[in-house]
Every structure is written in structure tokens, then in C-alpha cells.
């Protein structure tokens, strides 16, 4: 079986790139012939993280320029099945023209405006043989009638797995980019006004971003005690910090497509406090706590609530959120089965 993966790429080893390579690895290990095309998007800059990830793979991985339809067409012609990551019209049309099965993984919620790219994506999605959406939220924005040619498969490549003993955990952790609408300012204000012992409940802010100077100024101006800022950390150190927290706090106001940080936390038995934002409540699971996006008072009350939970109840909650996650995630070998089904449908 020849499988072609095509995905837009900004040049870093981000969530989409990691997932594309994880699925390609799985199928390659099962004996399939695999090729990966990363289509450069505007502002593409190849980072060391992606370069290193590519170097250890044994199957062909190429970067193509925007508008390189000839390479796409030749690659689709080679394939038995094409797996597009997000609805790229040139990919779907090439597969349709060459009568090749084409499936999609759709990462982003559907914009219903008339700008060219959303319109082209909607057309491409309708023409594909099957589409998987990464969350119920994303799925509903594209196909609220849940047609037979669509389904849900959360995208997860590699997750942290080292679990810190409950007795060695403390406080809260935030692990998102420091940009507007990710909720870091809301969280700081809520943490500042919450009536909790900051020495026992520190707040660790992982990551970095354009709001760094504003965040540092806010902490100093308002005299917010208990905040720790480790800066940008390598993955293994970042994952360790997450596992050492009692709660992951993810409070965006931006229509999150899924919410990978919540899934990462749950995989090391760290429960979550989130906002009712896009697919985030689904990612955080039914054992999470939640509030309205941007509501500082509600978030502060949740911080106070969890600080009063008994250790016994906390452990039960953490175990429950982990085991629910195990049933939520799906193994990558499901894709091999799905490819075989769609190929057979073309042969009948």
C-alpha cells in the first residue's frame, strides 16, 4: 500500500507535523510505502526541531513550495491512498482527477465567511472521500448532521508519561503561548484575587510570547506572590513540570479546536481547570472543572475550590481523569484499517 501524506507546514515541529509523522511512522512500521509532503505556508522558516525529526525517518519527506501543483499531482499518482491534513483543494482535486481515494484530517473549526481560503477548504472537504475531525466542536462546525463520510479522531502523537507521586505535587501550571486570548492575563488576575495560600499553591507559567513584558509588569505592579516563571524549557523538562503540578489551568477565549495541553496533563494524571471554549472541555474530560472564558471571578473561585479538596478526593479525581482519557484516545493502527476500507470502496 502506497500512502501519501500532505500537510501545510510553517517549518517548526508543531502539533500537526508531529501527528503527520506519527501516523506515517505507524504505517511504515506495518510495511506500507510512505511519502510525506510538507507544503510551505506564508512565513515558512525551517526550524531545527523539524529538521531533526525528519533526519531520523527512513521514508521520503519533502518540502514543496506553494503552488507546486506538479509535484502534488505526481505524488498523488504514485499513491494508493492520499491523506490530507486540512482540506487542501489542490490535493483533493488531484486525487479526484486520478481516481485515488482521499481522506482528510481536519484540525480547525469551519469559518463560514466568504474569504477565499475558507470557501476553498469547504469545497475540498465536500469532495473528499472521508473526513476525520479532531474534536466534536470542530466536527459540528463542519458537519452538524454527522454524515457517514465523517468521523472524529483526536490527534495525538506523543504524550508525556512520567507520573509524579501525588505527595510530591504542588500548585497550578499554565502551559500555553503568552499571547492574547490564551488567558494568561485572566489567570494572573484570578490567582491574585483568590483567597489561597500562595506558598502552598504556587502558579508556574511555562512558555513565552509577545505578552512577556506585560505579564512581568503585571506581576510586579500588583505584587502577585507565588508565581514562578521557568522560561522556555526543553520538552522533557516541560513535561516534568506539568507532572509536578496538582492542576493544569487552561483558560483561553479563542475557540480552541481541541486543547492538547489538557490531554498532556491528563496523561500524567493531572486534572484540569478550563474555560468553556471550543473543544477544550472535551479535551479536559468530564472530571475537569470549568468556567466561562474571561470570567476572572469564576476562575478565582475554582482555584479556591480545588485548594480545599481533600487529598483522598484529589487522588480519585486524578485517577478518573486519566482512565477516561485512555478510552477517549484511539490507537494509530485505526488509520491502516480505514485506508483499507476506502481503497476497497474504489475497487468495487
Model-derived regions, located:
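N-terminal strand-loop element at the rim of the active site
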Residues: 5-64
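Donor nucleotide-sugar binding/catalytic pocket of nucleotide-sugar-dependent glycosyltransferases
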Residues: 111, 126-162
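A charged, aromatic-enriched C-terminal amphipathic alpha-helix characteristic of glycosyltransferases
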Residues: 311-346
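Conserved donor-binding/catalytic core segment of Leloir-type glycosyltransferases
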Residues: 4, 132, 164-193, 204, ...
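Acidic donor-binding loop of glycosyltransferase active sites
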Residues: 79, 243-257, 270
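Conserved acidic donor-binding segment of nucleotide-sugar-dependent glycosyltransferases
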Residues: 288-297, 304-311
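Nucleotide-activated donor-binding/catalytic signature segment of Leloir-type glycosyltransferases, i.e.
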Residues: 216-233
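Short His-centered aromatic/hydrophobic patch
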Residues: 84-90, 106
Amino acid at each position: 500500500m502506497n500512502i501519501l501524506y500532505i500537510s501545510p507546514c510553517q517549518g517548526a515541529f508543531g502539533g500537526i507535523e508531529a501527528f503527520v509523522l506519527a501516523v506515517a511512522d505507524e504505517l511504515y512500521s506495518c510495511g506500507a510505502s510512505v511519502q510525506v509532503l510538507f507544503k510551505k505556508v506564508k512565513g515558512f522558516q525551517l526550524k531545527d526541531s523539524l529538521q531533526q525529526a525528519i533526519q531520523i525517518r527512513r521514508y521520503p519527506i519533502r518540502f514543496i513550495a506553494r503552488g507546486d501543483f506538479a509535484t502534488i499531482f505526481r505524488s498523488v499518482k504514485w499513491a494508493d491512498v492520499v491523506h490530507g491534513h486540512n482540506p487542501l483543494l489542490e490535493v483533493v482535486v488531484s486525487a479526484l482527477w486520478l481516481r485515488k481515494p482521499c481522506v482528510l484530517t481536519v484540525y480547525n473549526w469551519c469559518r463560514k465567511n466568504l474569504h477565499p481560503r475558507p470557501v476553498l477548504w469547504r469545497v475540498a472537504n465536500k469532495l473528499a472521500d472521508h473526513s476525520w475531525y479532531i474534536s466534536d466542536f470542530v466536527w459540528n462546525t463542519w458537519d452538524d448532521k454527522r454524515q457517514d463520510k465523517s468521523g472524529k479522531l483526536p490527534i495525538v502523537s506523543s504524550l508525556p508519561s512520567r507520573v509524579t507521586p501525588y505527595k510530591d505535587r504542588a500548585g497550578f501550571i499554565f502551559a500555553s503561548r503568552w499571547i492574547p486570548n490564551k488567558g494568561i492575563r485572566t489567570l494572573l488576575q484570578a490567582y491574585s484575587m483568590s483567597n489561597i495560600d500562595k506558598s502552598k499553591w504556587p502558579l508556574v507559567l511555562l512558555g513565552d510570547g509577545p505578552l512577556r513584558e506585560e505579564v512581568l509588569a503585571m506581576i510586579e505592579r500588583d505584587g502577585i506572590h507565588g508565581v514562578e516563571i521557568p522560561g522556555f524549557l526543553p520538552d522533557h523538562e516541560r513535561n516534568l513540570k506539568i507532572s509536578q503540578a496538582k492542576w493544569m489551568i487552561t483558560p483561553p477565549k479563542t475557540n480552541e479546536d481541541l486543547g492538547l495541553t489538557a490531554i498532556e496533563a491528563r496523561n500524567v494524571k493531572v486534572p484540569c481547570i478550563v474555560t468553556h471554549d471550543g473543544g477544550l472541555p472535551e479535551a479536559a474530560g468530564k472530571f475537569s472543572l470549568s468556567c466561562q472564558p474571561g470570567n476572572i471571578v469564576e476562575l478565582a473561585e475554582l482555584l479556591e475550590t480545588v485548594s480545599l479538596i481533600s487529598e483522598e478526593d484529589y487522588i480519585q479525581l486524578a485517577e478518573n481523569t486519566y482512565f477516561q482519557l485512555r478510552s477517549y484516545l484511539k490507537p494509530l493502527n485505526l488509520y491502516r484499517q480505514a485506508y483499507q476500507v476506502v481503497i476497497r470502496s474504489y475497487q468495487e
